Amino acid sequence: SGLKPIFCVGETLSQRESGETLSVLDNQVTEGLKGLPAPDVEKIAIAYEPVWAIGTGKVALPWQAQEACSRIREKLSDLYGAEVASKVSILYGGSIKPENFASLMARPDVDGGLVGGASLQESFADLVKTALTFRPI
C-alpha cells in the first residue's frame, strides 16, 4: 500500500519543566508499541513532537531534540534490539521552519522532520532540500 504509519510522542510544557521528558517518552513508546512484533515496528516512523511546540512557533533546541530522539532509539533498542532500533526513522516535529531545520537535522538521531503548517508554505521546498542534504535518499 505504500503507507508508513507515524507514531507521535512528546511531552507537555509542564512535563518538560518538571524534568519528566525522558520518562514520559519511555512510557509513551512502551505503551504505544505494546503488542507489536519487531517486523511491524521496523515499518513505522516515530516522531518526537513536543506538545508545547505544536503550532506555537516554539521549537525544541537542537540538543533537546537530540536528547529526546536518542532516548526513543534507546527505548526501541531495549524493547526490540539494536537492529530494529536502527531501522526505525525517528523524526522531529514541532514548528519546523527553514531557519531551524538544518540545526535539527545535523543531530545524529534526528532522521527527518514531521512538517505541519510549513508544508503549506512556498519555503517547503527548502525544507526538502535541507533534509536531502543530511539524509540523501
Q: What does each model-identified segment do?
A:
Residues 1-137:
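Active-site loop-to-helix "anion-binding N-cap" substructures in soluble metabolic enzymes
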